[in-house]
């Protein structure tokens, strides 16, 4: 799984024109020369169970992201190493705060907060929730901040009518 975390930049492409479910290809950079991960999610599930594989054959499972509860307002997700079964931590939604703009906390194996993930603009986030298709003109942007680390990681959507 090490190669999944070795890159400084990633490109995640999502197939949009799928009838049921979602499919993602993860590349080590924007040139998309080397695919380092693949995920296919089923539609209409009560609990999310996201599996990231090394490629489309699904022969090597790298990462498991599993929703903890069915009706969990705080949206806890366990993150597990697909090779060893070792817990890597938890990603938990900040309930009420996420109504206006998406906010998450990152926790280690012992449930200690080690970082945060949050939508960049509260104003745009609120407007996006009430005006359909505004996300096409103003895509979501997130910042990941890890406690004790310098700088942040920025996630930006790039809109394309067929993939993003």
Question: Where do the language-model regions lie?
Answer:
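Intrinsically disordered, low-complexity proline/glycine-rich segments
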Residues: 1-164
């Amino acid at each position: 799984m090490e190669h999944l975390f070795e890159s400084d930049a990633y490109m995640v492409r999502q197939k949009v024109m799928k009838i049921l479910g979602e499919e993602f290809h993860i590349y080590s950079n924007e040139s998309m020369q080397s695919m380092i991960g693949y995920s296919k999610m089923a539609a209409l599930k009560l609990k999310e169970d996201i599996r990231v594989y090394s490629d489309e054959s699904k022969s090597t499972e790298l990462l498991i992201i599993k929703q903890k509860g069915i009706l969990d307002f705080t949206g806890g997700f366990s993150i597990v190493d697909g090779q060893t079964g070792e817990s890597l931590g938890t990603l938990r939604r900040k309930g009420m705060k996420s109504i206006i703009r998406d906010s998450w906390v990152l926790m280690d194996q012992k449930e200690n907060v080690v970082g945060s993930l949050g939508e960049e603009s509260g104003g745009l986030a609120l407007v996006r929730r009430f005006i359909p298709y505004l996300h096409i003109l103003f895509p979501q942007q997130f910042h990941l901040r890890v406690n004790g680390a310098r700088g942040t990681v920025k996630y930006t959507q790039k809109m394309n009518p067929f993939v993003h």
